[in-house]
């Protein structure tokens, strides 16, 4: 049975899963979810994701939600497909896991808030909360200072090769690079180079094309 991703093309979480599938050379069907009408908060969608968020994922009889859990499933179950997104070395895997936690717990809260305020709200006709932007930018800057130090030690956050750690960052960075927050990334040379590297990955470019069809 075909892999299905139920989600919205504008959703960073949907983008994250799509990019992972394309990195692994896996075909999938994108099943659009109309979030404007609230489809994600109603049945039958709630049978796929009881929290009413996107995406939801189906691989045969298996149903998953939470984008980072989905990408980890894909990377492990389809380890022999496409690009290797996880580190097999038992001494390197914990380092990758640490930085995956950092992305989810330290980067995501501030980056996603900025994406919402500066990237999504203008598209859907909502007013940006300038105070929220200012506070989130300050907090994101602190995280990126740590990233700048980390990237002096290795080419990517999880180690010397591109992994899920880096992939998980891409959707928010993609949105923020077209906003005034771009300067927060560009002012840190190693962070700026890392962003350019991961945004140029063919799988990400292909994923955007698929989502925007």
From Swiss-Prot:
Gene3D superfamilies linked: 1.20.1050.10, Glutaredoxin
SUPFAM superfamilies per the UniProt record, alphabetical: GST C-terminal domain-like, Thioredoxin-like
Single GO molecular function: glutathione binding
Induction remark: By aluminum stress and phosphate starvation.
Domain GST C-terminal: 89-213
Binding residues annotated for glutathione, in chain numbering: 11-13, 40-41, 53-54, 66-67
Domain of life of the source: Eukaryota
Matches recorded under InterPro entries: Glutathione-S-Trfase_C-like (IPR010987), Glutathione-S-Trfase_C_sf (IPR036282), Glutathione_S-Trfase (IPR040079), Glutathione_S-Trfase_N (IPR004045), GST_C (IPR004046), GST_Phi_C (IPR034347), Thioredoxin-like_sf (IPR036249)
Keywords: Stress response, Transferase
GST N-terminal domain sequence ranges: 1-82
Catalytic reaction list: RX + glutathione = an S-substituted glutathione + a halide anion + H(+)
GO annotations of cellular component type: cytoplasm
Record GO biological process: glutathione metabolic process; toxin catabolic process
E.C. number: 2.5.1.18
Cross-referenced Pfam families: GST_C, GST_N
Family: Belongs to the GST superfamily. Phi family.
Role according to the record: Conjugation of reduced glutathione to a wide number of exogenous and endogenous hydrophobic electrophiles.
UniProt-recorded name of the protein: Glutathione S-transferase APIC
Source organism phylogeny: Eukaryota, Viridiplantae, Streptophyta, Embryophyta, Tracheophyta
């Amino acid at each position: 049975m075909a892999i299905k991703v139920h989600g919205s093309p504008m959703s960073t979480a949907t983008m994250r899963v799509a990019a992972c599938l394309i990195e692994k050379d896996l075909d999938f069907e994108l099943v659009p979810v109309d979030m404007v009408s609230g489809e994600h908060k109603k049945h039958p969608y709630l049978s796929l994701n009881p929290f009413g968020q996107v995406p939801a994922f189906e691989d045969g009889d298996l149903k998953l939600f939470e984008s980072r859990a989905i990408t980890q499933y894909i990377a492990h179950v389809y380890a022999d497909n496409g690009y290797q997104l996880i580190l097999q070395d038992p001494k390197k895997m914990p380092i990758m896991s640490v930085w995956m936690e950092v992305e989810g717990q330290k980067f995501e809260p501030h980056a996603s808030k900025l994406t919402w305020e500066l990237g999504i709200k203008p598209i859907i006709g909502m007013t940006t909360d300038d105070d929220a932007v200012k506070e989130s930018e300050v907090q994101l800057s602190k995280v990126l200072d740590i990233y700048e130090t980390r990237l002096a030690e290795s080419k990517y956050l999880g180690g010397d090769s591109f992994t899920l750690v880096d992939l998980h960052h891409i959707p928010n960075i993609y949105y923020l690079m077209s906003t005034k927050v771009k300067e927060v990334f560009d002012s840190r040379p190693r962070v700026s180079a890392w962003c350019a590297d991961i945004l140029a990955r063919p799988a990400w470019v292909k994923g955007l094309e698929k989502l925007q069809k």
